[in-house]
Amino acid sequence: FVIETHLRILDSDLIKVLKQAGLKAVKVGVESFDADVLKASGRFSVSKDQQLEKIRELENNNIQVSAMYILGFPTDNEETINNTINYSKKLNTTYAQFSVWTPYPGTPVFNEYKDKIIVNNYDEFDQYNLVYKHNLFNKEHIRKYLSKAYSSYYLRINWLFKYFKSFITS
């Protein structure tokens, strides 16, 4: 089975119990490299050292890790986005998912940003389109960052080696 959780919840004992119960993969929200970006968005994270330690512990227990990252937070800039992309490669999880920060209708964040919403079609609220007026980026900028994130992550020799190794051993 697969779970989606926050790294702060996982400890060695829980990882062992989940592994014994048949856990094969974990999805975790790393979201951003930048603690200030996370804090400004009302999010939190464990330290970078703890992230790396817990991810390696999962992998050492033959549990695949998918890390999820968000680009285009309201306080993101070119440096914070590039740092997040580079950090994803440092963590080198089995999979990485990159998405665009999206204030969903019906949420408090949507109400906070309703005057900045730039699309009328709710089909575009898909985490791959910038749906609000960002102070620095437009839709094309964010799409380029998403493309850069995916291509620079999945076209690395470190990731290809890890993927084929896990494919062969599974």
At which residue positions do the language-model features occur?
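Conserved SAM/AdoMet-binding glycine-rich loop
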Residues: 1-66, 71
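Glutamate identity and glutamate-enriched acidic tracts
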Residues: 4, 31, 53, 57-59, ...
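Conserved strand-to-helix beginnings and helix N-cap segments that scaffold or border functional pockets
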Residues: 12-15, 77-82
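C-terminal accessory regions of radical SAM enzymes
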Residues: 64, 79-82, 86-98, 102-170
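Short, small-residue-enriched loops and turns at beta-alpha junctions
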Residues: 72-76
